[in-house]
UniProtKB/Swiss-Prot annotation:
Name of the protein this chain belongs to: Acyl-[acyl-carrier-protein]--UDP-N-acetylglucosamine O-acyltransferase
CDD domains: LbH_UDP-GlcNAc_AT
Task performed by this protein: Involved in the biosynthesis of lipid A, a phosphorylated glycolipid that anchors the lipopolysaccharide to the outer membrane of the cell.
Pathway(s) where this gene product acts: Glycolipid biosynthesis; lipid IV(A) biosynthesis; lipid IV(A) from (3R)-3-hydroxytetradecanoyl-[acyl-carrier-protein] and UDP-N-acetyl-alpha-D-glucosamine: step 1/6
Chief location bin: cytoplasm
Length: 264
C-alpha cells in the first residue's frame, strides 16, 4: 500500500501506486497517476491529470497544474532504463503541460529543481538540468539536456537553450531567444543566436542591489563586451573589482564553470 498521510486529500479517481509516499495536507486531483517511487512533501497541491513517475522527490508547498508530466523517462537515446532521479524543491509553481524528465547516468543521474520557481505553460526541462531558486521560464521555454540555470534567471517565452549551456544568476533572456553559449550573470540577452544587450539593471534594483554594486557590475560588463580585451585579459581587472564588491565574484565563479564559451 502507498504511505499516505491521514490529512492528505486524494480524489477517488487518482491512481497512487504501492510504495508512493504522500505527505501531510497534500491534495491530489482527479485522474492523476503517482508512481511507486514518488515522494510528495507536505502541502503540495497536484491538480487533475498530472503524471509523476520514476524516482521522484517533490518538496513542500508546490503547485502542479493539469497535464504536467514529472520524472518520466527522458528522451536521451542512450538511456536504457538505469535508475536515475528527479528532485524538486519547495514552493514551485509548475503550470499546465510542463514536462520535467529524469536524469541520465552520463549526466550525473539527477534532474534538479530548487525552490520558488515558476515554469509557465508547456515548458520542457530535459534530463540532467539543474535549476536554482526563483527562476521563471515563460510559456514554451525549452531547456535541452544538462542545462544549468543559476538563481533569479528569467527565460522569455518561446526560447530554447542548447545542451550543456550555463546561464548565470540574474540573467534576463528575451522572448524567442536561441541560446547556444554560456550567458554570464547579471546581463540581458536576446536573439537567434542570443547576443548581450547590457546589464539587467531593473532586475537588480528590484532585488535590492546598491547603486555602487550595480555600477561595478556595469563596469565589468564593459570590460567583457566593450573594451576590446579578450576574456583572459579582462579577468585580472574583474578580480580587482571583486575585492571591493562581492557580487562581482559571481563573474569569476561563472567563468570557471563555463565550457561552451560565452555569448558575444
Amino acid at each position: 500500500m502507498p504511505l499516505i498521510d491521514a490529512s492528505a486529500k486524494i480524489h477517488p479517481t487518482a491512481l497512487i501506486e504501492e510504495g508512493a509516499k504522500i505527505g501531510a495536507n497534500v491534495e491530489i486531483g482527479a485522474f492523476c497517476v503517482i508512481g511507486k517511487d514518488v515522494r510528495i512533501g507536505a502541502g503540495t497541491k497536484i491538480h487533475s491529470h498530472v503524471v509523476i513517475q520514476g524516482d521522484t522527490e517533490i518538496g513542500e508547498d508546490n503547485q502542479i497544474f493539469q497535464f504536467a508530466s514529472i520524472g518520466e523517462i527522458n528522451q536521451d537515446l542512450k538511456y536504457q532504463g538505469e535508475p536515475t532521479k528527479t528532485i524538486i524543491g519547495h514552493r514551485n509553481r509548475i503550470r499546465e503541460s510542463v514536462t520535467i524528465h529524469r536524469g541520465t547516468v552520463q549526466g550525473g543521474g539527477v534532474t534538479r529543481v530548487g525552490n520558488d520557481n515558476l515554469f509557465m505553460i508547456n515548458c520542457h526541462i530535459a534530463h540532467d538540468c539543474s535549476i536554482g531558486n526563483r527562476c521563471i521560464i515563460a510559456n514554451n521555454g525549452t531547456l535541452a539536456g544538462h542545462v544549468t540555470l543559476d538563481d533569479f534567471v528569467i527565460v522569455g517565452g518561446m526560447s530554447a537553450i542548447h545542451q550543456f549551456v550555463v546561464v548565470g544568476s540574474h540573467v534576463m533572456l528575451g522572448g524567442g531567444s536561441m541560446v547556444s553559449q554560456d550567458v554570464p550573470p547579471y546581463i540581458m540577452a536576446q536573439g537567434n543566436h542570443a547576443q548581450p544587450f547590457g546589464v539587467n539593471l531593473e532586475g537588480l534594483k528590484r532585488r535590492g542591489f546598491e547603486k555602487a554594486t550595480m555600477h561595478a557590475i556595469r563596469n565589468v560588463y564593459k570590460l567583457i563586451y566593450r573594451s576590446g580585451k579578450t576574456l583572459e585579459e579582462a579577468i585580472p581587472e574583474i578580480e580587482q573589482y571583486a575585492k571591493t564588491e562581492a557580487a562581482v565574484s559571481l563573474f569569476l565563479d561563472f567563468f570557471k564553470r563555463s565550457t561552451r564559451g560565452i555569448i558575444r
